[in-house]
Amino acid sequence: MLALLIAAASQITVYAQVEFTATRDAFQKSYIQEATGDYTGAINALKEVYDEKSYELNLRLGWLTYLSGGFTESKAYYLRAISLMPYAIESRLGFVYPAAAIGNWSEVIAQYEKILEIAPNYSLALHRLGLIYYGRNEFEKALKYFEKVVNLFPFDYDGLTMLAWTHFKLNNMREAKVLFQKALPNTPGGSSALEGLQLIK
């Protein structure tokens, strides 16, 4: 009986090693094919070893199907990855790409807000939410996100200029001018900050 158990355990170990090697090789093949623009080949390489319970496979397939233009399929892979690891940020950031590509901005906003629940100071989500609301002319909403970005990164050119433009749109010209000026030591030839200062004169 003991000999049978040892043999079974040994067989499982060998199978797991073979499975690991096949998965690793499939990932490597997918990276090579992605680099050449063969997204279909990259996807097929991973589908040969696909396991719906694998976070990594779902994450990678979400990216590759997005690149190939399969936005609905991409969202499904990313959602599966999110369900497997709900506190992971990278899968939520990935989901945003196909959602934005099909114009589903409510889903984009929901994912960024969820990221901020998980990591309240995640500057990329803060900045992108600010950009979305700025683009919608919802400047008061944009303001709170850009303010937080600048508080976290006071010398960041993009954060400073977007906060400056938001103040400009809200007719807070003094604040806008100060922020445009603060942005220029970072990027002395920054066209956005220079344009803003020119408009305020």
Regions found by a protein language model. Give the residues of each.
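Mid-chain, structured segments of secreted extracytoplasmic proteins
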Residues: Y55-N104
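Terminal, low-structured helical/coil segments at or just beyond the last alpha-helical repeat
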Residues: F20, K169-K201
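Alpha-helical segment of the N-proximal tetratricopeptide repeat
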Residues: A22-D51, E56, R60-L67, Y97-A100
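Structural marker of alpha-solenoid helical repeat scaffolds
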Residues: Y50-E52, L84, I118, L152, ...
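Bacterial N-terminal signal peptides
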Residues: M1-Q11
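Structural signature of tandem alpha-helical TPR/SEL1-like repeats
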Residues: A35-N44, S68-R80, A101-K114, G135-K148, ...
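Helix-start (N-cap) detector for alpha-helical repeat units in TPR-like alpha-solenoids
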Residues: T23, Y55-L57, I89-E90, S123-L124, ...
